[in-house]
Amino acid sequence: MSVTAQNLTLLTDLYELTMMQGYYKKGQHETVVFDVFYRHNPCGNGYSVCAGLDQVIDYIKNLNFTYEDVDYLRSLHIFDDDFLQYLSGFHFTGDIYAIPEGSVVFPKEPLLKVIAPIMEAQLVETTILNLINHQSLIATKTSRVVYAADGDGIMEFGLRRAQGPDAGLYGARAAIIGGCVGTSNVLAGQLFDVPVMGTHAHSWIMTFPDEYTAFKYYAELYPDNCTLLVDTYDTLKSGVPNAIRVFQEFKDAGKPLKKYGIRLDSGDLAYLSKKARKMLDEAGFPDASICASNDLDEYLLHDLKAQGAAINSWGVGTHLITSKDCPSFGGVYKLSAIKNENGEFIPKIKISENTEKITNPGNKTIYRVYEKETGKIKADLICFADETFDESQDLLLFDPLETWKKTKLAGGTYTMREMLIPIFKNGECIYTSPSVTEIAEYCKQEKDSLWDETKRLFYPHRVYVDLSQRLYDVKKALLDQAHKPE
């Protein structure tokens, strides 16, 4: 279900509009190419998960300046009446290409490409980055947490700690894409048609005369899904014994609980879970689940798994929904080509003293190269959009910075897949977005195409993003031209 049926046109940085007015006054209407990409995987990860495309689509569809928008801009006393009149009739007429949501992606490759008249392409920069950066960050962080859980279910529990309602809502969406099995966020469940999950709070226990009574009444209310929070008073002396007592009473009454277990929210989770597991098993409840929460992240999960914690379900909140240790994604939006009067795209390059900030010029696309035998990703290849490749021929891959690092793939041993697909054509959306659940399933398949060495939490193997020979030659020529001796 679409959420952003709202107009976000003014959700932009002021300088986008001041530049637009400058282009308008100069009569600049040429078509340009902008690329969205990032330079480093967040959290030291070996890959990222791109997300947020569906919200970009909604944003572009609803892009228009209302009377109130124009009136507000007039009140700033920055913009001339003729430019404001132009904005009154503004709508997006360009093309957008993007990598599908849920794809694994790597630094410096275009996640999204805008081809549009300069004023249109300039305006959409800020909001596209806002939408892609946030959800890609949370989807990537979630992937790390899911990896650390090693097959256990991860529930997204972060709404109350998110940086505002939008971050909570779209963070939950991104978390499902990244691999969470459900969310506590009821609005996210409604809007995105994803599973909602939860247990109860300590306050539930505290409002009853005693813990046993609270547990029993909760089990009577929810016999099909009953997880009892056992650490309000004393986990091993009170909480677990009272939970077992309730489970046994329902079993003896011929009404055994269908899906049931306990939740730990404090203390030494490894120690308590192993003790609780032993108590549950000895009481005849080996199928009772043990869920844990309490400021978890991928590192703590990794350690708890290594210590043999008897936990099979995890509620992860603050560290996931805020990506606490790596709170930004770093996506950028850079001009890469301008179309001339002959309809040809002239490559443009941004040069920097910092090598990693030098951009890749031209109207480009990306091909993912897979090892045919295993289906695993070998590399990504950035090339000009009009380049084609023959999988029956040898393919030379080389590092664009350390060009002596080369790999030749023999024809017939690899396959290639173009990653950028058309989303908008001449201002019209031509793409049908999959559901969030479908994106999550696709993301799981995408991660299966990664080597285990790339998925590990610590010092992951790098997936190379290479340039075609033609693109490399053009980039080198532009750099040589810019640094020509006087």
What are these regions (language model features)?
Residues 28, 32-88:
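N-terminal, Lys/Arg-enriched amphipathic/low-complexity engagement segments
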Residues 96-102, 414-419:
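Short acidic, Pro/Gly- and aromatic-enriched capping/linker segments at domain boundaries
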Residues 71-72, 140-144, 158, 455-462:
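Short coil/turn segments at secondary-structure boundaries
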Residues 197, 262, 290, 312-314:
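Hydrophobic residues within beta-strands of alpha/beta enzymes
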Residues 1-31, 40-42, 78-79, 84-93, ...:
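Buried, small/hydrophobic-residue-enriched core segments of structured protein domains
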Residues 58-63, 98-101, 105:
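An N-terminal, globular interaction/scaffold subdomain
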Residues 2-30, 43-45, 283, 288, ...:
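Gly/Ser/Thr/Ala-enriched C-terminal appendages of enzymes
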Residues 33-35, 93, 154, 332, ...:
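A residue-level signal for beta-strand positions that form part of recognition/binding surfaces
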